[in-house]
Amino acid sequence: EPLLNYEQVTCALRLARASDGQLQIGGRKMTVSTAGHVPGILRLSEDDLNVGLAISLNATEDETRSQIMPINRKWPIADLMAAAKTYFDRKGRRVTFEYVLMDQVTDLDADADRLAVITSSIPCKINLIPYNELAPGLQMSDRVYRRPSSARLDRFTRRLKNATRHTVTRRDSRGRDIDAACGQLHRRVTDAQSAVSATPQPA
């Protein structure tokens, strides 16, 4: 979580944008991504760094979001939306909301409708990300997370676009066939390392 390392992250951003530095990257070309660290968002909104803000939202109601993103138990969706609105009001930059679509978990018609409602007062872009399945399915509590079918992805995207005035995009995920898409490779490597660690070593 970048905003838990606020000083280091903002120092790096300043070095990247420095006019006498080697990179000279403008603030409008840099984005800070967060899982929803509300105090960090508010602090960044007061900073002189005019960078973009991307928030991993991933659910439209607190019960589901708290299951898949424990940070929500501390800063629920209402607080997160208020912080995002504050960021826009102070910076004048659209916020990006990242939203992972999981079959029968976050891809319901009601989710599309709620997503349009909770973002209605915040100038933003909504980036839909189809879930990249792990094999076997990653299970948390009583839920197994799966990627929605193409038909369900299209239905959600279409419904959201019809319900909101915001820009809605859907990420084209690549590398799933070799478990190298977002979130997959790390899990495969971690599982392999765990298997090696559990193998008895010769005395």
Label for each model-derived stretch:
Residues 162, 170-203:
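Radical SAM enzyme core and accessory elements
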Residues 97, 168-170:
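Generic structural signal for residues in well-ordered beta-strands
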Residues 1-2, 38, 177, 185:
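Gly/Ser/Thr-rich beta-alpha loop segments that engage phosphate groups in nucleotides
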Residues 2-163:
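Conserved AdoMet/S-adenosylmethionine-binding subsite of the radical SAM
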